[in-house]
C-alpha cells in the first residue's frame, strides 16, 4: 500500500491530489487547491511551500509526483511556474519524500489515452477512475491525474524489473 501526493503547480493556484494505491486499486483520499492571493511572488512561493508542507503532514504520503515545466509562450510565466514547482519540491524534499516528475502529455496519455486531451476529459476520467460523485476542480483533477500516472508508471516499472529478474533466472512468465 502506498499513498501518493500529486501536485499541479502554479504561481496563483496549485492543485493537489492524494490517492492510496493497494495493488491495482486506487482510492481517493483528498484533493483541492492552494490559492495565493498576495501579489508579490516571494510571498506566493512561501504560501505554496507552507500549503504543500501542511498537506504532507496531514496525509503522510510515501511518494510525491509533480508535473514538469512545459515550454510556455510567455517566458515570465514559465519562470514563475518553475519557481512554484521549486517551492513544492523543496517542501517534499524537506519531508524526505522521493520526488517524481511527469510531463503533462504523459499524464494525459496515461489517464485519458490521448496526449492532447482537454482538461474536461482529464476531469471526467479522474472522476471515473477514482469513482468520485462529481468532477473535481480542474487543478485538483490534474494533480490527481499526476498521482494516478505515478501509480501506473511505478506499477509497470515493477512488472518490467520482475520480468527481467525472472528472465535472468531463466524463467519467463
From Swiss-Prot:
GO terms for biological process: DNA recombination; DNA repair. Its cofactor is Mg(2+). It holds the Pfam family RuvC. GO terms for molecular function: crossover junction DNA endonuclease activity; DNA binding; magnesium ion binding. Mg(2+) 1 binds at residues 8, 139. GO terms for cellular component: cytoplasm; Holliday junction resolvase complex. Mg(2+) 2 binds at residue 67. It catalyses: Endonucleolytic cleavage at a junction such as a reciprocal single-stranded crossover between two homologous DNA duplexes (Holliday junction). Binds 2 Mg(2+) ion per subunit. It is found in: Cytoplasm. Its EC number is 3.1.21.10. Keywords: Cytoplasm, DNA damage, DNA recombination, DNA repair, DNA-binding, Endonuclease, Hydrolase, Magnesium, Metal-binding, Nuclease. It is an enzyme of class 3 (hydrolase). PANTHER family: CROSSOVER JUNCTION ENDODEOXYRIBONUCLEASE RUVC. The RuvA-RuvB-RuvC complex processes Holliday junction (HJ) DNA during genetic recombination and DNA repair. Endonuclease that resolves HJ intermediates. Cleaves cruciform DNA by making single-stranded nicks across the HJ at symmetrical positions within the homologous arms, yielding a 5'-phosphate and a 3'-hydroxyl group; requires a central core of homology in the junction. The consensus cleavage sequence is 5'-(A/T)TT(C/G)-3'. Cleavage occurs on the 3'-side of the TT dinucleotide at the point of strand exchange. This is Crossover junction endodeoxyribonuclease RuvC.
Amino acid at each position: 500500500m502506498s499513498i501518493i501526493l500529486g501536485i499541479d503547480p502554479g504561481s496563483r493556484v496549485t492543485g493537489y491530489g492524494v490517492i492510496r494505491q493497494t495493488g491495482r486499486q486506487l482510492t481517493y483520499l483528498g484533493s483541492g487547491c492552494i490559492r495565493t492571493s498576495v501579489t508579490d511572488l516571494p510571498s506566493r512561493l512561501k504560501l505554496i511551500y507552507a500549503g504543500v508542507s501542511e498537506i504532507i503532514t496531514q496525509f503522510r504520503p510515501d511518494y510525491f509526483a509533480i508535473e514538469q515545466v512545459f515550454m510556455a509562450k510567455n517566458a515570465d510565466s514559465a519562470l514563475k511556474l518553475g519557481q512554484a514547482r521549486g517551492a513544492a519540491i523543496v517542501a517534499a524534499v524537506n519531508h524526505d519524500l522521493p520526488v517524481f516528475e511527469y510531463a503533462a502529455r504523459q499524464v494525459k496519455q496515461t489517464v485519458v489515452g490521448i496526449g492532447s486531451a482537454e482538461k474536461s476529459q482529464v476531469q471526467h476520467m479522474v472522476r471515473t477512475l477514482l469513482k468520485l460523485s462529481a468532477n473535481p476542480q480542474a487543478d485538483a483533477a490534474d494533480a490527481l491525474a499526476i498521482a494516478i500516472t505515478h501509480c501506473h508508471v511505478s506499477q509497470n516499472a515493477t512488472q518490467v524489473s520482475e520480468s527481467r529478474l525472472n528472465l535472468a533466472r531463466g524463467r519467463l512468465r
